[in-house]
Curated annotation (Swiss-Prot):
Pathway it works in: Amino-acid biosynthesis; L-arginine biosynthesis; N(2)-acetyl-L-ornithine from L-glutamate: step 2/4
SUPFAM superfamilies xref list: Carbamate kinase-like
Location of the protein in the cell: Cytoplasm
Entry keyword Transport: no
One MF term in the entry's GO annotations: ATP binding
Top EC group: transferase
Biological process according to GO: arginine biosynthetic process via ornithine; L-arginine biosynthetic process
Xref: InterPro entries: AceGlu_kinase-like_sf (IPR036393), AcgluKinase_fam (IPR004662), ArgB (IPR037528), Asp/Glu/Uridylate_kinase (IPR001048), NAGK-C (IPR041727)
One Gene Ontology CC term in the entry: cytoplasm
Gene (UniProt): argB
Amino-acid positions noted as binding substrate in the UniProt annotation, renumbered to this chain: 64-65, 86, 190
Membrane-spanning residues: none
UniProt-recorded name of the protein: Acetylglutamate kinase
């Protein structure tokens, strides 16, 4: 009986959060280990379906880099890199779009639907969801100032038209978005999935933006940091305490906050049911950044 009561108490712990977030939108960037391991994929799909059933509106933006690499290798398409950044020419972009929109996106949709959800897969091109422009990559070379490099059909979001997302949500669907957008010239552009998720969250005025990563969260001096303000994050970046691949994730969170998103989270996607732990428990998981 005690074990049963303990389970009931765990369920009741979620009640105030269900009440608080019911009817609200949560944008989730799905990538990393959570997309690679079978048990984590299943727990992710169950988390998303449960959110929908308790009245929360999840919107998913996904990555898919490893799948792109595998297909490029199998097709023997040569890849040029500039200081570690892939140059995306027309042939490479065709593969990127094929993998992200045609394969990975549909796998995620099927995964969610198999758990009882109603997911619909789209890209930034559908319903004029996103318009983008080509964007060079800023790279800081050792001992030199930052420089801009043209890496091809890689873009940044210029505008989001969330009408298609509102319509899908109204009909009870779960949008699953691949990070491909169209330029005004009609070119397909590959968009960083974290950045895309942040822009979607801002356009929807989401309650939360959650980035699933392959780390515990933001580590300062080797310790997990949470309850972080915008100003504190800027300070950490300026001092070099946040560096490398974590910087664009943090900047994406800050941009979302500037657009009206209440809370942003960088959490460990390697932990089973990390989304539910973050949303429905008192302790949460990972790093919280808020205004």
């Amino acid at each position: 009986m005690e074990k049963l009561l303990e389970r009931v108490n765990h369920i009741l712990e979620a009640l105030p959060y269900i009440t608080k977030y019911s009817g609200k939108t949560v944008v989730i960037k799905y990538g990393g280990a959570a997309m690679a391991k079978a048990d984590l994929k299943e727990s992710f799909a169950k988390d998303i379906v449960l959110l929908k059933y308790v009245g929360i509106h999840p919107v998913i933006v996904h990555g898919g880099g490893p799948e792109i690499n595998r297909l490029l290798d199998s097709l023997k398409i040569p890849t040029e890199f500039i200081h570690g950044h892939r140059v995306t020419d027309t042939q490479t972009m065709e593969v990127v779009e094929m993998v992200l929109t045609g394969k990975v996106n549909k796998q995620i949709v099927s995964m969610i639907n198999s758990q009882g959800g109603k997911a619909v897969g789209i890209s930034g091109k559908d319903g004029n969801l996103a318009k983008a422009v080509k964007a060079p990559i800023e790279i800081e070379l050792e001992g030199k100032a930052k420089q801009l490099f043209d890496v091809g059909l890689v873009g940044r979001i210029e505008s989001i038209n969330p009408e298609i997302l509102h319509n899908l949500q109204k009909e009870g669907f779960i949008p699953v978005i691949s990070p491909v957008a169209e330029s005004v010239e009609g070119d397909s552009l590959n968009i960083n999935a974290d950045t895309f998720a942040g822009e979607i969250a801002g356009a929807l005025k989401a309650e939360k933006l959650i980035l699933l990563t392959d780390t515990e969260g933001i580590l300062i001096d080797g310790k997990l940091a949470t309850g972080l303000s915008r100003g504190k994050m800027k300070e950490y970046i300026r001092k070099g305490e946040i560096s490398g691949g974590m910087i664009p994730k943090v900047e994406c969170c800050l941009a979302a906050i500037d657009q009206g998103v209440n809370r942003t989270h960088i959490i460990d996607g390697r932990v089973s049911h990390s989304i539910l732990i973050e949303i429905f428990t008192n302790q949460g998981i990972g790093s919280l950044i808020e205004s």
